[in-house]
């Protein structure tokens, strides 16, 4: 074998010159031999095999794409369980509900057994019972200041005001300060002076008063049942310096009388059975009075009598 042929064997690329059959057979034989094929292969084949057998880079354990895909599937409404419709008969229940109504009417309630119209007719046919009440049979003493001051100067004791509420009589008494030790009592009777009771009064501290007079208060509970034929009267006694001063409303006593409320709203006084009571007829017209007269002022504005003169604002003298 010549050198030229050896070069041809080592270099399988075709030559420009003519190739002999022996050379072709030699190439075919050498090409099918594994050791020589791997050794005599072209550089391009070696380079291609090197890239094929090169190890690939490792992939991360956590796949971001798969995590995003799982989140997308979790947020997607298709991932929720589908709703199913189950009928009652599939579980052994009835498909219909039966309600039975009775033709008999129910018993009416006791508080609704009457209609409003029936109640109106019944109330119009009823007669109102006469209700007995107790009222004072005297005006408030301090309403007429001039008269009150005169009586106070003369008797040294005088009832100032009085009220009746819930069958309890309360009031205040004015007395002259003639001594340090004083005793004021209210003597009251509920059976036309067959018996009487003395009730002690309580001293009240005068904040804006003078040293010439003192004020006492009292509270008397009336009996629950008082016959209409019996009189309820009281007076006031004042003990000072061994003397007793009385205020008995100019010898008439202070009276509490029974009255009856008629269905028409008129209030009439009940007269005792043992005496003849004459009721003064009501005046149909008011008597004309001079504007600014004491009678008109005392009836409408009793305090005007004390506002008109400065000396009336002083203590009772």
Swiss-Prot record:
Ubiquitinated by NHLRC1/malin in a EPM2A/laforin-dependent manner. PANTHER family: PROTEIN PHOSPHATASE 1 REGULATORY SUBUNIT, PROTEIN PHOSPHATASE 1 REGULATORY SUBUNIT 3C. Pfam families: CBM_21. It comes from the Eukaryota. Keywords: Carbohydrate metabolism, Glycogen metabolism, Ubl conjugation. The N-terminal region is required for binding to PP1, the central region is required for binding to glycogen and the C-terminal region is required for binding to glycogen phosphorylase, glycogen synthase and phosphorylase kinase. Residues 149-257 form the CBM21 domain. This is Protein phosphatase 1 regulatory subunit 3C. CDD domains: PBD_PPP1R3C. Residues 141-263 are annotated as: Interaction with EPM2A. InterPro entries: CBM21_dom (IPR005036), CBM21_dom_sf (IPR038175), Pase-1_reg-su_3B/C/D_met (IPR017434), PP1_3C (IPR030683), PP1_regulatory_subunit_3 (IPR050782). A motif (PP1-binding motif) lies at residues 84-87. Interacts with PPP1CC catalytic subunit of PP1 and associates with glycogen. Forms complexes with glycogen phosphorylase, glycogen synthase and phosphorylase kinase which is necessary for its regulation of PP1 activity. Also interacts with EPM2A/laforin. One of its GO terms (cellular component) is glycogen granule. Acts as a glycogen-targeting subunit for PP1 and regulates its activity. Activates glycogen synthase, reduces glycogen phosphorylase activity and limits glycogen breakdown. Dramatically increases basal and insulin-stimulated glycogen synthesis upon overexpression in a variety of cell types. One of its GO terms (biological process) is regulation of glycogen catabolic process. One of its GO terms (molecular function) is [phosphorylase] phosphatase activity.
